[in-house]
Amino acid sequence: MVKVGIAACGTTPFTKDDDQIESTLFKSTNNLFENNSKINKKDIDAVLVSTNNNSKYLSPILSEMVGIQPKIAHSIESLCNSGTNSIVSAYSYIASGLAEMILISGAERHDSPGQILQWDNSRGEFKHPIFWASIFTKSYKREFSISDERLAVVSVKNHKQAKENPNAISNNTYTVQDVMNSKKLTDDLKLLDCSRPCTGSASIVLATEELTKSISDDPVWITGIGQKTTSASFTKNKSFTSMESTKAAAQSA
């Protein structure tokens, strides 16, 4: 099996800006190339774009914007699994010999259409992610006797880590009491329990072992990869306290 590494990365700040998706993709890709001068764009065999945005033809557009003429160029959409799907696809292209170096760029806007699923009747009238999250939260709290205070600790930890990330949309820290006192959105989730929709992009380059070593002195090697789809809706879940697909993917990796 061909050894595959993550040789380079680039990102934008995540904001509430109203930038077009094409512009956002370009910014993270440009950041990647600015920070990795050893990459020869002529060596990039494929460009994959990961997004829930409804814009079309994004991969060829991005390729032209950054001066790449790849053999393979296409977009990948699978809601919150889009980024993982892109990495699995790129890994497979390289492992099979169809490509040696691949640029993957993911981007979303604050108004992503992926926030609402009109097709899924199993959710009834509750089509926004806050309601899906609330179903899992209520079930988990009931199953494991989790209090609202203990749940709030997760948000406190996440905001503390975000403050250390210069590209994060949130740069504030909060206490458990702050989270508890924030606006109630559902019976089990408050405003500060939730992540904020934002506009931003990140890009990475995957490559064969030889090319990865020629680009980076400190690459990340993909030593295992796994993926699993159990269903698109909630109806096939064994319970609402865990994600069986996540467990299966981890075991596969």
Language model regions located:
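Short acidic, glycine/serine/threonine-rich loops at helix termini
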Residues: D18-D19, P113-Q118, K163-P166, F234-T235
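Condensing-enzyme catalytic core mediating Claisen C-C bond formation in acyl metabolism
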Residues: M1-D19, S23, A152-V153, K184-S252
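Short coil/turn connectors at secondary-structure junctions
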Residues: M1-V4, K42-D45, Q69-I72, S96-I102, ...
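Hydrophobic pocket-lining residues that define ligand/cofactor binding sites across diverse proteins
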Residues: F33, Y93-I94, T212
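Conserved thiamine diphosphate
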Residues: H128-S170
